[in-house]
């Protein structure tokens, strides 16, 4: 696994010494050696690499990495730029962005532009076996990503959480900082998007909150890739 070298390291360093993380590390190492696992090992911590803790403005919490090839690269909901097929949940996110902020729907699902602006695109589980959804659940990633969420909660500045669906919303008891804004909606998957994700206007609400606190809003428009 790639090393964490930015300001996330002091925030999560204690986790590496805990028994659960040693077991998790051994499990993940063995999985990569004997089967196909996504994302590529060097991309596991991309959410942290691309969005330093000191720059987090928004946290969008996903669950499991995409489990088909050429999709997962360490950012929740995002797929690699050469992947022309946009996953259904991300298609619905783009539809909501179009309705909410007038964003044009792009021809790709590569969300690094958001990460570079301070949107932490975090999954609660950071690896998965190819074609086996949820195959690395319950192995320790949840405890590690809880430590990441707790580090964000401890930041003494305005931050927005977008929590879509019950698994993401199960983290709400951890979010105790009165300076932070929690936005809740159903998951954008085709199974639940029409139950309240469409029309939630989370993106404009987040930008309004950031602007009210003197923070540069997010440019949510993802550009086309030729």
Where are these regions (language model features)?
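A polyanion-binding, active-site-adjacent surface
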Residues: 2, 7, 14-160, 167-170, ...
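C-terminal substrate-binding/active-site "lid" region of AdoMet-derived donor-dependent transferases
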Residues: 197
